[in-house]
Amino acid sequence: MKKIFWALTFAALLPWSIAAQDARQRTIATIIADALDQLPAAKQQDYNNIMNELMSTGTAGIVLLGEMLVPADKGKNASIEHALYGVVSYVTAPDKADKRAEVRKGLAKAIEKCTDNPNRAFLMSQLQRCATVEDIPVFVKYLHDAYLAEWAINGLAHTEGANEALLDLIKKEVAPREKLAYAVGVKRLKTAEPILLEWLKNADAPTQKAIYHALSICGSSASLSTLEKAAKAAKYEW
């Protein structure tokens, strides 16, 4: 029954998904349908085999999985989300680093094609888990998206090796100062301290709170008097 369901689902999706084939002459759509039909797997080895097959579908397979996500009022996404989460976990293993690029590209394309905000956020959260500095432009693209901005700034904040790029974005103020200050705190970006201190001069309450938090994490002696004044104003014992 599950296999029939996935077959009907794929029939309603993109015709290009039929094109690529594996050694068993299965199309990408068939490989994904077979994998979804076997999830959740009872044994670890079976699970690994399923993830390996999903990974083998490359960018096109990830995009197709993304297109299968539906709005919450239209159906359930548990199996597809489980598959995407599993593939991302699989390619973030040290010995699978060479397979990560296609998954990252697939997630970026899936985000762009998706029109449902919660599903876009889910896809971006998965990209965050496997992102490299090459994905920074993807996150920057959504910094001004009313719904995705929070996920985008989290992506930047948690991407390894993004310190220099983040500092440049802070200098250009490509996003609200409050969100950028949050990223500084997560990254412990000491080089951003002078900018944060300057921002405090005309910051609103939420931005002040974010800046104080960031400075408490990565600030130097240059921030001590500022933090002390803020603590006293809040009647916090210093």
List where the protein language model places each region.
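Bacterial N-terminal signal peptides
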Residues: W6-P15
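Alpha-helical, heptad-rich or low-complexity scaffold/stalk segments
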Residues: D37-S89, H213, A230
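Core register positions within helices of long alpha-helical scaffolds
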Residues: E53-S56, H82-Y90, Q126-R129, G155-H158, ...
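Amphipathic alpha-helical scaffolding segments comprising HEAT/armadillo-like alpha-solenoid repeats
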Residues: D22-D37, T59-P71, A93-E112, A121, ...
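Short inter-helical turns and helix N-cap capping residues of alpha-solenoid HEAT/ARM repeat scaffolds
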Residues: A42-K43, A72-N77, T115-D116, H144-L148, ...
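Positively charged n-region of N-terminal signal peptides that target proteins for export
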Residues: M1-I4
